[in-house]
């Protein structure tokens, strides 16, 4: 439910979101957000301290986004998260930006690749909703 509240915040900031987007590195980002200026944010969702400690794949995400955030519930202390990331405190109904993430502008080829991945994943998911039986693997 952290993802739902976070997506609501991102939409209020002018972003469209997609969950579980496969990245060129082979990893999957919890939430990827894209705005009309082409900015790409990745949000890694953490539900516990153990979740953060056990999962270090987020370090790979920075090369695929302009800004990297962690979203978590108010039960977790902010101090456990890396200092060079943004922090979003969320629940099932909404979220607020605790601190902004520093910007690391993507190179143009990476931005294009990520934008195309975002668009293709979104279109495929819509097509599966419209025609669930007519969608085999490409």
Where are the language model's segments positioned?
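Flexible, charged surface loops at secondary-structure boundaries
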Residues: 10-11, 36, 62-63
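Short, flexible loop segments at the rims of nucleotide/cofactor-binding pockets, characterized by
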Residues: 20-22, 44-51
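Surface-exposed, flexible loop/turn segments at secondary-structure boundaries
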Residues: 25, 39, 51, 76, ...
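Active-site beta-strand-loop-beta-strand hairpin of nuclease catalytic cores
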Residues: 29-42
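Amphipathic coiled-coil/heptad-repeat helices and related helical stalk/stem segments
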Residues: 2, 27, 53-57
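Short coil/turn segments at beta-strand junctions that form active-site/ligand-binding loops
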Residues: 13-15, 39, 66
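Non-catalytic C-terminal interaction segments of nucleic acid-processing enzymes
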Residues: 1-19, 25, 80-138
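Catalytic cores of nucleic-acid endonucleases
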Residues: 47-91
């Amino acid at each position: 439910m952290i993802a739902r509240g976070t997506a609501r915040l991102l939409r209020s900031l002018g972003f469209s979101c997609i969950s579980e987007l496969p990245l060129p590195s082979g990893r999957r980002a919890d939430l990827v957000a894209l705005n009309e200026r082409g900015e790409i944010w990745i949000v890694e969702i953490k539900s516990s301290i153990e979740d953060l400690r056990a999962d270090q794949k987020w370090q790979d995400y920075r090369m695929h986004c302009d800004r990297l955030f962690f979203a978590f519930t108010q039960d977790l202390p902010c101090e456990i998260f890396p200092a060079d990331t943004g922090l979003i405190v969320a629940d099932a109904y909404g979220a607020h930006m605790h601190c902004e993430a520093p910007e690391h502008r993507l190179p143009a080829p990476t931005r294009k690749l990520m934008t195309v991945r975002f668009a293709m994943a979104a279109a495929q998911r819509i097509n599966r909703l419209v025609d669930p039986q007519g969608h085999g693997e490409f």
